[in-house]
Amino acid sequence: MNELIKHKLELLPDSPGCYLHKDKNGTIIYVGKAKNLKNRVKSYFHGSHNTKTELLVSEIEDFEYIVTTSNTEALLLEINLIQENMPKYNIRLKDDKSYPYIKITNERYPRLMITRQVKKSDGTYFGPYPDSGAATEIKRLLDRLFPFKKCTNPANKVCFYYHLGQCNAHTVCQTNKAYWDSLREDVKQFLNGKDNKIVNGLTEKMKSAAMTMEFERAAEYRDLIEAISLLRTKQRVIHQDMKDRDVFGYFVDKGWMCVQVFFVRNGKLIQRDVNMFPYYNEPEEDFLTYIGQFYQDTKHFLPKEVFIPQDIDAKSVETIVGCKIVKPQRGEKKQLVNLAIKNARVSLQQKFDLLEKDIRKTHGAIENLGNLLNIPKPVRIEAFDNSNIQGTSPVAAMVVFVNGKPSKKDYRKFKIKTVIGPDDYASMREVIHRRYSRVLKDGLTPPDLIVIDGGQGQVNIARDVIENQLGLAIPIAGLQKNDKHQTHELLFGDPLEVVELPRNSEEFFLLHRIQDEVHRFAITFHRQLRSKNSFSSKLDGITGLGPKRKQLLMKHFKSLPNIQKAEIEDIIMCGIPRTVAESLRDSLNDPPK
């Protein structure tokens, strides 16, 4: 069991769901379900197993999981994931062994049937039911409750069920279309969970039968009520409308966004996509950018419908994507969006928890890193990252790790002063020069290693400043990310080369944490600066409102909308003269010309 798995096992939730074991290539080799993900997944890596399971465990290099809200959902999701991914260690379930549905036919005299094949044009379907025995019992229950046609006899010939009071196809009802439509609607209501009327009626009949000592009949009514109770279990993982949908949910925390997409095909949830990245603007804006880029990728099929959370503007998404956009308000569809949001939250929290646990597991990582790079043990590491959006409000940040732990009192922020427009190389040159000129001037302790969040270009710029301009001898490494914004490669040496670094090693986790931390720190500073600049620019030109008063307003109200909502007296309370406060309100509330 590698260190990555050890860390992730400690973070598993006590929830039902599905887990996906992966090999060294990231290929899914086994899909399973669990009532309790923590207990089930841990069991693979503890205790003895049979030969087959031992072989499976020997190939597991990583795992992921999807949280569901019930055991039934986990079971149904497992089937879909197995059919989609065909893992080599799973018993592969064929399509003809799919779960049964209950069907009301569209015939003149409708019938109730159990079927495993869904054809939307010839009836209304309910299910699927993971227990085929339960589906049969439900069908029997419906036969006893609703007098649909139950045989293939011609309409002028009565059948056995007619004499039991369970078939009205041979009575005067047979020519009454309204009767059959009403009966069909009653079943729909019943199978959709609106069964209180029937349950109440059966309860009264049960009590009445018991009062008259008809205990067998009372028991029959009791059994019917219990069968109805079984039917009340509803699934959100599969929908009988057979539509193709993508379901989006997202969660943000600590400057990071996680987006989860559930892919529903033919009414079945078959796969999900998870992506985590730092966000720069308001979360809603960056989500819109993400969803636009998502469907620009030709590998992503555009479905009939896309479900999005409530806080996203549906018209904007529809303009970007070009298909029907739905913000579910209630019921199963809303719960499916909520499930995507829940999984996004869980995934993001797991990322942070892993990083937090990594902090406590850095024993030996620093020494190993020094040995790997052939440098003295890097006790003090200083890392740099730039942040800008199309050149606006460019900033940089430095974080410091001492003995593998962040030393936040040593963190530094930099506003880029000499660079115009988006130029990461020039920005890096300025920041490195400013930082280490100060180190020389003030006699500060230089770091044992400088880490640049970037590739060959940024590292060479930093080396030129350190060695050629300042005459220092400090090792410099670069950390490159992949297209998913994850730590990917370590660059070091002269000339620069990729250093082989096991992804499950402690030194990899240390560098991963450093890169994430400097990125987070830079993004947070950039966002704060942009917000402050936006705030100040809207207040420019108002007579009597100088830098100090703007600062007072910013400190008290935090945002322009809060000032717009404030009363004049609230603004005056901040130390702003009444005439200036009135001018401010007038300026902010006047429509743009």
UniProtKB/Swiss-Prot annotation:
Residues 14-91 form the GIY-YIG domain. Residues 196-231 form the UVR domain. The keyword DNA damage applies. It is found in: Cytoplasm. Keywords: Cytoplasm, DNA damage, DNA excision, DNA repair, Excision nuclease, SOS response. The keyword DNA repair applies. Gene3D superfamilies: 5' to 3' exonuclease, C-terminal subdomain, GIY-YIG endonuclease, UVR domain, UvrC, RNAse H endonuclease domain. GO terms for biological process: nucleotide-excision repair; SOS response. One of its GO terms (molecular function) is DNA binding. InterPro entries: GIY-YIG_endonuc (IPR000305), GIY-YIG_endonuc_sf (IPR035901), GIY-YIG_UvrC_Cho (IPR047296), RuvA_2-like (IPR010994), UVR_dom (IPR001943), UVR_dom_sf (IPR036876), UvrABC_protein_C (IPR050066), UvrC (IPR004791). It holds the Pfam family UvrC_RNaseH. GO terms for cellular component: cytoplasm; excinuclease repair complex. Belongs to the UvrC family. PANTHER family: UVRABC SYSTEM PROTEIN C, UVRC/OXIDOREDUCTASE. The UvrABC repair system catalyzes the recognition and processing of DNA lesions. UvrC both incises the 5' and 3' sides of the lesion. The N-terminal half is responsible for the 3' incision and the C-terminal half is responsible for the 5' incision. NCBIfam families: uvrC (TIGR00194). Interacts with UvrB in an incision complex. This is UvrABC system protein C.
